[in-house]
Amino acid sequence: MKIWKTVLLLAFILGNIQSYAQLNSKELQKEQTTIISGLTGASKIGNNKVLKHRWDIQSRTIARNYLANWIEKTGLKIQEHPYTIKYSWFKKIKGTNIYSIIPATNSSDEYIILGAHFDSVKNSPGANDNATGCAMLYGLAKKVTALKTRNKNIIVVFFDQEEIGCVGSLAFAKFIKNKKYNVHSVHTIDQMGWDKDKDQNIEIELPTPTLKAIYEKHAKLLGVSALTTKVTSSDHRQFRASGFNAVGITEEYKNRDTTPHYHSSTDTFDTVNFEYLSFATGLVYNVIEELITK
């Protein structure tokens, strides 16, 4: 009889844990939906502003402040990283990244960088590219902040001006290198809202063998695949060029299950698969959780 009581008690506890996890997942998905709605002009933000794109200085500033407010809701402090980059022999580019540091709970000088760009191309709402990446980054920041044990520090960064040649990430990679941060790995997110075939697979771009193995492991545990590609067209490339272990994370860009609305006026809020975004957020979080708690 005692054994049966114990079994029932365990079942009750596990059921409550599962229900709590599902509730948290639904709550986070709702927040991610709201973030993308604001970034894409589907709803008003700031002083009743409607973003048609995130291309010019004014729209990027509004988007940056909007994301800063969301991150600060998690209790984190946002810092600005203004930069000036030589774009060509006759032109310099100015922009501003924003970042936050989630400190380790134990003494550590190691850092993991999580990043996503917040700008879009001109005349595109940029829902999939890359409001989805920003929403995933927010979700990761919120979940990591809630961890009781963190054996590594986390830097959460929103990059400016990816769409003109990954300029913001280039500036941030140089900033981190000049500061001599001991960086374990860099994980950048770009386009995470399309899954027409509903297989929930993700792609990992140019991962190191160690990062490849851990992403594949956690994907397999969830019954999906993390497919390796050699894509170099997003922010991870700037960190690789600076000598860091970096990986890009995206939907099936090379495996032909990616948004048909890329860099167009039809890359709108209503084209985003929020269930897929939520699932992929959980997958990437599982990877990061293992990396910072082991």
Placement of each model-derived feature along the sequence:
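A non-catalytic alpha/beta surface segment that caps or lines the substrate-entry region
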Residues: 41-103
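Solvent-exposed loop/turn segments at secondary-structure junctions
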Residues: 84-88, 105-107, 118-122, 161-165, ...
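Extracytoplasmic/secreted proteins, especially bacterial periplasmic and envelope-associated proteins
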Residues: 27-38, 58-78, 132-139, 143, ...
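N-terminal capping segment at the start of a domain
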Residues: 22-61, 119-120, 189, 257-268, ...
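Active-site-adjacent substrate-binding region
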Residues: 197-294
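Bacterial N-terminal signal peptides
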Residues: 7-16
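Acidic/histidine-rich catalytic neighborhood of metal-dependent amide-processing enzymes
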Residues: 94-95, 120-222, 226-228, 236
